[in-house]
Amino acid sequence: MKQKLMVGAFIAAVSLSAAAVDMSNVVKTYDLQDGSKVHVFKDGKMGMENKFGKSMNMPEGKVMETRDGTKIIMKGNEIFRLDEALRKGHSEGG
């Protein structure tokens, strides 16, 4: 019984630290012309947030235009990764 509790506590600690690390993985946020945002993670993959603050699907390779007119290409489609960060209260990258 004691061993099961220790294993459970270990798993909980690892899960909590993994969530905290994921929050810090957003290094850049681009505001797009349509009001949505693209968040870039440390590994270069991206997640898309709509103008209502919800993560959304964006096909890899899609060309998007930022508010200042810069064009960027979607790399990856980190819906679940971004959704987790948004649910934890993350709204802006570095």
From Swiss-Prot:
Stated induction or repression of this protein's expression: By Cu(2+). Maximally expressed 30 minutes after induction with 0.4 mM copper.
One GO MF term attached to the UniProt entry: metal ion binding
Keyword Signal annotated: yes
Annotated localization: Periplasm
Major localization listed first in the record, in broad terms: periplasm
InterPro entries tied to this protein: CopK (IPR021604), CopK_sf (IPR038644)
Keyword annotations: Copper, Metal-binding, Periplasm, Plasmid, Signal
Signal peptide: 1-20
One GO cellular component, as annotated: periplasmic space
Top-level taxonomic group: Bacteria
Subunit organization: Monomer in the copper-bound form. Homodimer as apoprotein. Dissociates into monomers upon copper binding.
Record's function text: Involved in resistance to copper. Can bind up to 2 copper ions. Has higher affinity for Cu(+) than for Cu(2+).
Protein name: Copper resistance protein K
Lineage, top ranks: Bacteria, Pseudomonadati, Pseudomonadota, Betaproteobacteria, Burkholderiales
